[in-house]
A protein has these predicted regions:
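N-terminal membrane-anchoring/stem segments of glycan-assembly enzymes
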Residues: 1-44, 330
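Catalytic donor/gating beta->alpha subdomain of glycosyltransferases that bind UDP-sugars
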Residues: 157, 163-189, 214-217, 221-285
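Acidic donor-binding/catalytic loop of UDP-sugar-dependent glycosyltransferases
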Residues: 88-89, 140-155
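A conserved acidic beta->alpha catalytic loop
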Residues: 83-93, 111, 142-143
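Short, acidic, metal-binding catalytic loop of nucleotide-sugar glycosyltransferases
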Residues: 66-76
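Cell-envelope/extracellular polymer assembly enzymes that use nucleotide-activated donors
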Residues: 46-49, 78
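Membrane-embedded multi-pass helical conduit in multi-pass membrane proteins
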Residues: 42, 293-368
Length: 372
């Protein structure tokens, strides 16, 4: 074969990669970009159990727990903190809070659950202790973005809804690392919200997630993956979510906020733990997510090669088509998730994803550690 033909094939490969990317933007991400929640004629209220698992989180509880305790909610609710074998002052702090907030209940765990790493056992105990059908989950290092978090999240439920996916954001701070963390959080949320809207829900985040007790016990809780430290959120949603029983809520009042990692090493450790569950996803989800990641990873190397060896005019035309599509989708999605300050950086983030996949790809084959 003539040497020139190889670079034609390379350019055609670049075009194919771009077409696949455009498919994801049009078929999946457009759904979130142009999403408008159904307007309800009458507001519903139902009892809610907020559940927070904590281990040696006294400082975070002191800082964030009041945000869950002072919610403006028109009907009965409770806040359950599962204090899982803490050695710090969590017990005494919670006892003081209970004197003021009668809706606060504490589940004290004083013995480790053998063979069940992570927070799945304490979370199961919290759900078992919950008085009400609707449970709303968050973490000790999270605070609701508004006093209407409970109210707005439970409004999402209707007769068929059993799972509600919320957005767990990070506090906005200065520095490149903060922007990288928030970009990755946004980019992940854009995917799982869009997939849910397309009838293919595959994950949620434990920082802001709600479901009904009945669906939890119907699927026997976390028994299918009790041996894995992570997965109390995404692997359960993978098991229990269907196109008809899952909804999203992206009202800004329903967001939760967390402190981002302070160093790249801390963030890398978090991502290693989170991505360790990806290998357990359903085959369709693994294929769709893997194909998207692969085409995103290959896009810029093929762009550079096409510019150098085929023809920069043609390569830049293909790049421009994808860029315009990205500009539209990212603007609308970032606006919906209150991440507009990231928008001027989106081209930088898009290029960064090439290096991101290299750094974190080993987590897909690495055995997860058995930690809380």
């Amino acid at each position: 074969m003539n040497f020139t033909h190889w670079w034609q094939l390379l350019f055609y490969g670049f075009c194919l990669i771009t077409l696949i990317q455009l498919f994801y933007y049009c078929f999946f991400f457009f759904r979130l970009a142009f999403y408008k929640p159904n307007t309800k004629t009458a507001s519903q209220t139902q009892p809610v159990s907020v559940i927070i698992c904590s281990r040696d989180e006294a400082a975070n509880l002191a800082k964030n727990l009041p945000g869950s305790l002072v919610q403006q909610y028109r009907t009965t609710h409770e806040v359950i903190v599962v204090n899982d074998n803490s050695f710090d002052d969590s017990k005494y702090l919670l006892e003081e809070y209970q004197k003021t907030f009668k809706q606060l209940h504490v589940v004290e765990l004083k013995q480790e659950a053998r063979f069940i790493p992570g927070k799945k056992f304490p979370l199961s105990m919290g759900i078992k202790a919950a008085k009400y059908e609707v449970v709303l989950l968050t973490d000790a290092d999270c605070v609701p973005a508004s006093e209407y978090w409970i109210d707005k999240m439970q409004e999402t439920y209707d007769e068929d809804t059993e799972i509600v996916l919320g957005y767990g954001a990070y506090h906005k701070k200065s520095g490149v690392l903060n922007k990288l963390i928030r970009w990755e959080t946004f980019h992940t949320a854009m995917q799982y919200f869009s997939y849910a809207l397309a009838g293919k829900p595959y994950m949620g985040v434990g920082r802001n997630l709600s479901y009904k007790k009945t669906i939890f016990f119907r699927h026997k809780g976390f028994t299918a993956h009790n041996n894995i430290a992570s997965g109390d959120d995404d692997l359960f949603i993978k098991t229990a979510a269907t196109p008809s029983n899952t909804k999203i809520n992206i009202d800004a009042d329903t967001f939760t906020l967390s402190e981002p990692a302070k160093t790249f090493g801390q963030w890398a450790k978090q991502k290693t733990r989170h991505y360790s569950t990806a290998k357990y996803y359903k085959p369709l989800h693994k294929f769709l997510l893997g194909l998207y990641s692969l085409t995103q990873f290959l896009f810029y190397p093929l762009l550079v090669a096409s510019i150098l060896f085929y023809g920069w005019q043609y390569a830049l035309i293909v790049f421009a088509v994808r860029f315009i599509m990205q500009a539209i989708v990212y603007y609308l999605c970032m606006k919906k998730l209150n991440e507009q300050d990231l928008y001027p950086w989106f081209l930088f983030f898009d290029i960064w994803m090439f290096f991101y996949y290299i750094i974190f790809s080993f987590t897909l084959i690495r055995k997860p550690k058995r930690v809380w």
